[in-house]
Each structure stands twice: as structure tokens, then as C-alpha cells.
Design a protein with these regions (language model features):
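Expand to "…catalyze enediolate/carbanion chemistry for C-C bond making/breaking, isomerization
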Residues: 2-534
Length: 534
């Protein structure tokens, strides 16, 4: 049981090791507010998670998603979302990262328009990380955040990025907090504490409580968030519509309901984002037993692959028809300081990616490293001199269900690609279990999505008749095990002694093998991994 100075609401228990900042995060009024939201909405969260499972059974039986006939009137109707607040009309470059103190300061200072402060995929949800993240964002909102490290001081500069925290997805619990004997929703926990402590302060400073919403699978899941927003604002006396949220379209099923998601959130919408890596993961996950579905090496599946191109263009068209921001996807590259040729090759990839997004009509884009902000900004400044390009309507874009489901390329699947999946999986899960969810791997800043693709591809290649390497060998459990053992031996020399000592790479490899060799597919690797951390 938590050693807390705060009286808990009836039915609530907190079972976690006390961390220094939690007494100012978990105040009595904040916890009461959290409990009220959880009691009001937890039954619906569970119903929606059950709907996900039922829908997966239909996909396993061969059904494919389609545009919903019952919501045709919404798709064909002439309506717009509520206008955007002044401070988020221009979002040309957004930086993403976890909520540790140094990252928050550097991200807010880096020249980006906004900072997606991540409680989700770039974060390992230890109790300490969740509590410190909330305290760090509260200090950032008030402009008081500072940090000292190795004789260097960090503090906020003059103009800072606008904050967009990302709470956890509907599938994740906050295991340290139970209400009436059951864990509370991780997403409601993250949202409620941030909103309670910061909404009025943000509004007083000319900004507002803005959020990114991950992993939605339907407009009904968007409706749940909208109802939470409406109740939260009413409870605290915050004007209705103050909350604005950008939904990451990062599941194949949500791509069929983009209009409906904007409609459900229209008082609270800040548009949609092209969540490319989780989107690929979702495609593999949803059609994992479909014998016709099998994607090539992860490196071959890019934003120019036909099904990815269709999804991105449909998102831009859908958003702009509703006067909503259409945000481009992540550039995960990290500047390579000791190899100018490799660095130039990486940066040229970033430039090509951002030029495509800007000319497609995106209103901004994501980067994972401050060093990429000037590159992305220069491109959007060139193609988008105005704050956004909502006016770029894209009447030329006509995307069908068939286009969204045209999953190519299927080849090549190579041993090198499989080894890369395994090595990335070992490194990411090993770091995550050590408390770090944002991990530099092979000059890319990776979050959970890349590890999800990696293990899902191998799981499917083992089971699909199309899971055959370019040299003719079938991918099997035995081949996977052989590669895993070999790659684990290489990990210490790749990550370095210091990182290897702080990570849990052997445990990570074991978990990677368990979930990949298992006959039943694990929906999210972070679910079993969460049980292994404090």
C-alpha cells in the first residue's frame, strides 16, 4: 500500500512505492476527480475492448473492414469541426518524446511548434515515470521547470512549443491504482491528472488543454473520449470545447472511420495524424491469420507503398473537408555525428519524406530529434508560407476500401530483415524493461511501435505459407530461435557496455521469444511487459 498523506476516495487503493513528487500530483481533489471519471466511464471502456475482441474474431474468419453503411450520412454531410485556438493554428513542426525532465525542457526549447509529451509508446510506465512526468508537465506549464546535470543547467527559453500530452491507449491499465478492486484506465489516469492540475492555468496563459489520442479503433472509442472531455470540463468549470485533441490514425480500422471520428470529437477536435508505424503494426495484427496477407521486410514498407499512400492522402482529404488539421508522420532519424556521409543520406530521407507530406497537403509533421526541426521547418516554410493548408481540398483523391487494403509489397523477406527485426526487438524490449521507452537503435529513435511490427512480422512469417525467405527457406520457430540466440550474443557490442548494464536484454529476448513463438497472438507486447516492471 502506498505511504501517502492523501486520504483516498472510498474503494480506491494505491499500491506503489512512494516517489518524492507524488504528494503534489495525487492531491485529494485530483484523486477524487480521477475516481469520478473512472466510475463514470470504465464500464464503457470494457465494452469497447470487448468489441475489439469480437471484431478480431470476424477478421480471423475472413471478414475485411469497410466504410460503415450506417454512418454514410456523416461521411456525405457538409459540416466542419469547431475552429482551432490561435496558438495551434500553425503546427508545422511537432517534436515527440517522453516526459522526463531534460527531454521536456529541450523539446519545449527546440523551435518546434508543439511538443507531443508522451505517456504512451515512447514511455515506460513505471510508477516513478508516470508521477515524475505529471510533475514535469505541471512545472513546464507554469514556466518553472529546471534541471541540473553534470554541471549544466537547463531551463525554458522565451518562446516555447505548445504542449500536447499523449495519454495511454484504451487497452492499458494503471496497475498501481485500483478502484472497486479493478485497475483504473491508464488513459483516464493520465488525462485526469494533467487536466485537473493544468487546464485552468493553461487557459489563463492563453493556451489550453490539448491532447494526442492514440490507438483508437472506432468512432465509438472517439465518442468515449469526447464524453470524458465534456464531463471533465463541466466538473472543473472549464468552458466546453476548451479541450482540443488530435487523434492518431494508427489502426487500419480507424482509417475507415476518419470522418466519423472527427464528427464525434467535433467540439474538441484538433484534427488527425498519420501514425505510420503503429498503422503498419495494426495491419499485420488485424490480418495475422489471413493466408493472403504477408508483408515484406519492414524496411520495404514505406509511405510510398500503395496502401500507405492511400491512407495518407485520404487522411489529408478528410481533414481538410472538415477544416481540421492533417498532421504528417514521424521522422525517426537521429543526426549521425561521426559519419558525414551516413548523416547526409539519413537527412536526405527526412527531406524527401517532409517534401512529400508538405506537397500532399499536410499542415505539419513530426520529428523525434531536435536536430531535425530546422530541416522539417525549412521544407514546410517553403511549401506552406501560411499557417496551415486547410484550403488544399484534394478533390483529385478518391480512395476505396480496396486501395486501403492493397497490402504490398509481399517480397522480399530476407534473413537480414528478420535479423533486424529480432535485434530491434531485443534492444527495445530490453531498454523498456529497464525503464526507458524511447530508444535510439541503428540511428533511429524508436518507440514501442517498431518493436510491435518486428515481433508481429516474425510471428506471421512463421505461420503464413508466404513466410519464405528470398533464398527459399521457410521461416520457422527453429530458425527464429537460432537467429534470436545469435543476435542476443551481438547485443552487448552493439549497444555498449553501459547501456547493456542498465537494460534487461536477456529478459527482453526471453519475452520476445515467448510472445513470438506463442500460438495465441499477444495483442500488445506492452501488456505482458508491464507486469515485469514496478
Amino acid at each position: 500500500m502506498m505511504d501517502t498523506k492523501t486520504a483516498l476516495p472510498a474503494g480506491m487503493q494505491i499500491d506503489a512505492k512512494h516517489v518524492a513528487v507524488q504528494d503534489r500530483v495525487l492531491t485529494a481533489p485530483a484523486i477524487a476527480f480521477l475516481a469520478k471519471l473512472c466510475r463514470a466511464f470504465e464500464p464503457r471502456r470494457q465494452q469497447l475492448l470487448a468489441l475489439r475482441a469480437a471484431r478480431q474474431k470476424q477478421f480471423d474468419g475472413g471478414m475485411l473492414p469497410e466504410f460503415l453503411p450506417e454512418t454514410r450520412a456523416i461521411r456525405e454531410g457538409d459540416w466542419k469541426i469547431a475552429p482551432q485556438p490561435a496558438d495551434i493554428l500553425d503546427r508545422r513542426v511537432e517534436i515527440t518524446g517522453p516526459t522526463d525532465r531534460k527531454m521536456v525542457i529541450n523539446a519545449l526549447n527546440c523551435g518546434a511548434s508543439t511538443f507531443m509529451a508522451d505517456f504512451e509508446d515512447a514511455n515506460c510506465p513505471t510508477w516513478e515515470n508516470m508521477m515524475e512526468g505529471q510533475a514535469n508537465l505541471a512545472d513546464a506549464v507554469r514556466g518553472t521547470i529546471t534541471f541540473e546535470q553534470a554541471g549544466k543547467s537547463y531551463k525554458l527559453g522565451g518562446k516555447t512549443a505548445v504542449l500536447f500530452p499523449r495519454p495511454r491507449g484504451w487497452h492499458l491499465d494503471e496497475k498501481h491504482v485500483t478502484l472497486d478492486g479493478k485497475p483504473v484506465s491508464g488513459g483516464i489516469f493520465d488525462f485526469a491528472l494533467y487536466f485537473f492540475h493544468n487546464a485552468k492555468e493553461l487557459l489563463a496563459r492563453g493556451s489550453g488543454p490539448y491532447f494526442y489520442l492514440p490507438k483508437l479503433e472506432s468512432h465509438l472509442e472517439a465518442r468515449l473520449w469526447n464524453d470524458i472531455f465534456a464531463m471533465a470540463q463541466k466538473e472543473l468549470g472549464v468552458p466546453h470545447g476548451s479541450i482540443k485533441a488530435t487523434v492518431l490514425i494508427e489502426t487500419i480500422v480507424a482509417a475507415f472511420e476518419m470522418d466519423e471520428i472527427l464528427w464525434e470529437l467535433k467540439d474538441h477536435s484538433a484534427g488527425l495524424n498519420i501514425g505510420r508505424w503503429d498503422y503498419i503494426f495494426s495491419c499485420i495484427k488485424k490480418f495475422r491469420v489471413n493466408r493472403d496477407f504477408c508483408l515484406a521486410d519492414r524496411s520495404q514498407v514505406t509511405m510510398t507503398s500503395p496502401f500507405m499512400r492511400s491512407y495518407a492522402l485520404l487522411l489529408v482529404k478528410t481533414c481538410h473537408r472538415r477544416n481540421a488539421p492533417a498532421m504528417g508522420g514521424m521522422a525517426a532519424q537521429i543526426p549521425i555525428k561521426n559519419d558525414p556521409a551516413a548523416n547526409e543520406a539519413a537527412m536526405s530521407k527526412v527531406r524527401a519524406d517532409k517534401e512529400r507530406e508538405a506537397t500532399d497537403g499536410c499542415d505539419g509533421t513530426w520529428v523525434a530529434h531536435p536536430g531535425l526541426v530546422p530541416i522539417a521547418k525549412a521544407i514546410f516554410d517553403k511549401y506552406m508560407p501560411q499557417p496551415n493548408q486547410y484550403g488544399k481540398q484534394r478533390p483529385d483523391v478518391n480512395v476505396s476500401a480496396k486501395d486501403l487494403l492493397a497490402f504490398q509489397p509481399e517480397a522480399p523477406i530476407t534473413e537480414a530483415g528478420m535479423r533486424n527485426n529480432v535485434q530491434v526487438g531485443i534492444q527495445y524490449i530490453g531498454s523498456w524493461l529497464g525503464g526507458n521507452g524511447c530508444v535510439p537503435i541503428f540511428n533511429l529513435m524508436e518507440d514501442a511501435a517498431t518493436a510491435e511490427i518486428s515481433r508481429s512480422q516474425v510471428w506471421q512469417w512463421i505461420r503464413s505459407p508466404k513466410g519464405v525467405l528470398a533464398d527459399g527457406r521457410k521461416v520457422t520457430r527453429e530458425l527464429f530461435h537460432e537467429i534470436l540466440v545469435d543476435e542476443l550474443k551481438k547485443t552487448p557490442s552493439i549497444v555498449g557496455a553501459e547501456a547493456y548494464a542498465t537494460g534487461k536484454y536477456v529478459q527482453g529476448a526471453k519475452l520476445f521469444e515467448e510472445i513470438t513463438a506463442s500460438d495465441s497472438y499477444v495483442e500488445f507486447l506492452t501488456l505482458p511487459a508491464y507486469q515485469a516492471i514496478d
